[in-house]
Amino acid sequence: MPVLHNRISNDELKAKMLAESEPRTTISFYKYFTIASPQQTRDALYQVFTALDVFGRVYLAHEGINAQISVPQSKVETFRQQLYTFDPALDGVRLNIALEDDGKSFWVLRMKVRDRIVADGIDDPTFDASNVGDYLKAADVNAMLDDPDAVFIDMRNHYEYEVGHFENALEIPADTFREQLPKAVEMLREHADKKIVMYCTGGIRCEKASAWMKHNGFNKVWHIEGGIIEYARRAREQGLPVRFIGKNFVFDERMGERISDEVIAHCHQCGAPCDSHTNCKNDGCHLLFIQCPQCASKFNGCCSEQCCEELALPEEEQRRRRAGRENGNKIFNKSRGRLNSKLSIPDPAE
């Protein structure tokens, strides 16, 4: 019987990936469609992906699939063919290719079955997730940005918006997608007669959000096809002005893709212009925050003097201090300080 999960340590897998000579391509894709047996589908797909040396993070649920992966360049076309023939619903699914890619985004394949591929918190049985807004392509996006009757809504988390967003886009201040949905409805009531344009990283969140807005009575709703990634790619290919400012946060080891030269965020320690996310080097903290090179040197990659001092302690003493401490990593929020999160790199499904 085939092994359907990883049995090798993370450290060993990461070292193996870093030693690879063949370049990899980072790809993301999603599809809302009915999966009758998510576990059975997961197990079958796991075998397909492992045979092609695919790494990454894949979620499956009755409502569909959400994946961020890396594929050896020589196997990308084979991967595409096998994915498209795996299920009729996946035939022709859009594959978002990373804009900036060193091929080191993932080093292990994790494939999980969940209740939802995006944690939305929606429990309304009358909600129809298929009743989505209209797609906007790159040229349409730029036209909408110049339309005074249009309002752009960023459906990403605060730490994503902080480092990059579309011109004049509204932030829905929240730490998770499930918190954003009701806030978006509340905040946009005063703009109910406007054209609502929603966007996110790759399209999965804004697609569901557009359906939620229509469910709540908003009639003029659009969402950007393929999200920021596809918009920037197509705009560059077509010679259009790229109207996204700053960096696009991504949920892998890269933590960001440069879209424009502007740096709109600031170091959380000294306030210098900076948009590079990192995790505190203190294993007892792992705060996700923005740190400039000067502060990284000053604090030895830590988020505070306290963590810097703790990192300098003998390993045994560090372990003793971590014992009993809340087992969860944190994200820095400028308005609320430290927040708990489940991963060093936040979970894209949250």
From Swiss-Prot:
Family: Belongs to the TrhO family.
Compositional bias of kind Basic and acidic residues: 319-328
Positions of the Rhodanese domain: 146-240
Listed GO biological process terms: tRNA modification
Annotated source species: Salmonella heidelberg (strain SL476)
Task of the protein: Catalyzes oxygen-dependent 5-hydroxyuridine (ho5U) modification at position 34 in tRNAs.
Gene: trhO
Domain of life, per lineage: Bacteria
Protein name, entry field: tRNA uridine(34) hydroxylase
